[in-house]
From Swiss-Prot:
CDD domains: Radical_SAM. This is Biotin synthase. [4Fe-4S] cluster binds at residues 67, 71, 74. The keyword Iron applies. Belongs to the radical SAM superfamily. Biotin synthase family. Its cofactor is [4Fe-4S] cluster; [2Fe-2S] cluster. PROSITE patterns: RADICAL_SAM (PS51918). It catalyses: (4R,5S)-dethiobiotin + (sulfur carrier)-SH + 2 reduced [2Fe-2S]-[ferredoxin] + 2 S-adenosyl-L-methionine = (sulfur carrier)-H + biotin + 2 5'-deoxyadenosine + 2 L-methionine + 2 oxidized [2Fe-2S]-[ferredoxin]. Keywords: 2Fe-2S, 4Fe-4S, Biotin biosynthesis, Iron, Iron-sulfur, Metal-binding, S-adenosyl-L-methionine, Transferase. Pathway: Cofactor biosynthesis; biotin biosynthesis; biotin from 7,8-diaminononanoate: step 2/2. It comes from Mycolicibacterium gilvum (strain PYR-GCK) (Mycobacterium gilvum (strain PYR-GCK)). Homodimer. One of its GO terms (molecular function) is 4 iron, 4 sulfur cluster binding.
Amino acid sequence: MSDILAVAREQVLERGVGLDQDQTLQVLQLPDDRLDELLALAHEVRMAHCGPDVEVEGIISLKTGGCPEDCHFCSQSGLFASPVRSAWLDVPSLVEAAKQTAKTGATEFCIVAAVRGPDERLLAQVAAGIEAIRNEVDIQIACSLGMLTQDQVERLSAMGVHRYNHNLETARSFFTNVVTTHSWEERWETLQMVREAGMEVCCGGILGMGESLGQRAEFAANLAELDPHEVPLNFLNPRPGTPFGDLEVLPATEALKAVAAFRLALPRTMLRFAGGREITLGDLGAKQGILGGINAVIVGNYLTTLGRPAEADLQLLDDLQMPIKALNATL
């Protein structure tokens, strides 16, 4: 049998064809002593098909906690005994957060809400926030507001939402182990409506929730079929009070193999470091990931957990001579 990295070099690097599910599984099964070789190839693929620029994004929680869904990783579910309580952010606070995000050089600011889907109150707050931000801050605006109806998709598009995030979270075959209050297919339907409305699709998930390597490869194949503009990769940071609160953190070598494997499966997709990378990878792992396929980062804090200081990520990019993607390059 041909060596999978030799196959990937010819197929992905030279021809630009992503690995299929079986090939991705072979990459995930590589021994640790081939990790450096794997990361180097993933970096070559990223540079060849995406270029050196790194997109920087900040996120803010407009509505925190009190969500009716039972996503087992999430401390914002109202169904679990987690310490997170429901709270809303006002429009001036949204504008200030957007300003601080823009100061980092970020081109993307994502407004997030812990909901099954937006109601009229939330949509009105989002509309007011977007209008206020546009009047004061030069930055692209994304949203992550759960599952949408066709009317809501059209309204968000009319507001000028640049990109919409809705994560599939995990492989289709593993989804019912993670969420039971809605289906994988419902999420998929929202993503299709978003694309048809002309917004960029952002869709990723969380690694380390108990899925097998085969299901991790399946997830990469699911995403390749969806073909989103961006894939955020999160790593489970077990939250107290949630059903996944006692799971072990993913080993760093396993997480880095996944980063590289997803790059080889999705050679032209924006692959973003998201939540959990600090506890899973640490500072060294963050550097290895950016030199192993990653070409976008979330700076600052996440929704309910602390991230690396923005300055640390920006300094790392500077040290690695990775230019931050300019706003005019995204328009």
